[in-house]
Amino acid sequence: TSTAYIVYSLVLAGTTAFDLGGPVNKAAGFVALGFTTEKILPITARTIAIVTPSIGLGLSTLIDRRLVGRKVYEDEFYELGKTSMFLAIMGISEGAIPFALERPSFTIPLYVVGSIIGAMSGVILGAEQWFPESAIWAWPLVKNLGVYILGILIGAVIIAVVNVYYRNNLIKKGKLVIDED
């Protein structure tokens, strides 16, 4: 794995996760698509970064009560979390947008960092995806699929755990109020 490919993957993952299907994401996609269709560079970092934030936020709604002993989201976010994970498996990152809209100054950088760490883990450990699709039906085309999934999980777990502890800290400080059932 060359240094240039590592830098490209890092930038690609960050720009892909930044706005979840928005213009920065689309610009990154056009560049990546050009490289992958010409067989210059694989699109692995992008396909991992597309699904990582949505899986991470969905996961956070499943583990919050086990991790910190309380809800850290309003009730509607628990359903949105399940939807977010389902959409991620379909290759759609926009399921994480409602979470980003609530606290964008924290959540968006978290998406970027978690996606970069997950994508770089997959890339450095040898996952390789040339087909420009992040949905589960394209996963059989991934070289080293186990490592690819590991990269997604690493990034998603980072996003989930950090977000749960961040929100729990806000609750403790009285900066976030969640109705307990």
Predicted regions span which residues?
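Pore-lining transmembrane helices
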Residues: 1-178
